[in-house]
């Protein structure tokens, strides 16, 4: 049986929209918010007024400013931060990850300093037992937050991981 709890690391418009979607289909979402003031505001108002204004966050979304708290023992972690911050975030998260964690990248781009792709960054920083996948597609945060029909692709080196992630996001 699937654990109905997921960590979303990054509360920009895309991370917030994915959190809303996951909460609407029954997942408890630990949403890591980098900005402490924004985290407190989201807790108070149940809205991310800076990155995704006008959308009420479901009760199943639990904002936190602590990466350790955001992981909270979850084995599915969605990374939704700008590429140039991914390496630092993963280094910080590593001690809190379960050996069988599934790390899903929902960003795009390359690391400016090293010219590494996100996949390369994940391979260099994560324990070898962690599985890695990418979520991508022609979607917009506001459309996903509104619950409009969307198509998104998940890719992983392991078909079983791709299918697992697909079942999580499908509704």
Predicted regions and their residues:
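NAD(P)+-binding Rossmann beta1-loop-alpha1 motif at the extreme N-terminus of oxidoreductases
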Residues: 1-55, 62-65, 92
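Short acidic-hydrophobic sequence patches enriched in Asp/Glu that either
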Residues: 30, 34, 114, 161
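Exposed alpha-helical structural elements
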Residues: 37-38, 160, 164
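Rossmann-like NAD(P)(H) cofactor-binding subdomain of soluble oxidoreductases
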Residues: 57, 67-72, 76-149, 162-166
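A residue-level signal for beta-strand positions that form part of recognition/binding surfaces
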Residues: 60-61, 151
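Short beta-strand-to-turn element immediately C-terminal to the catalytic PLP-Schiff-base lysine
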Residues: 153-157
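Short, intrinsically disordered, charge-balanced linker/junction segments flanking boundaries
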Residues: 167-171
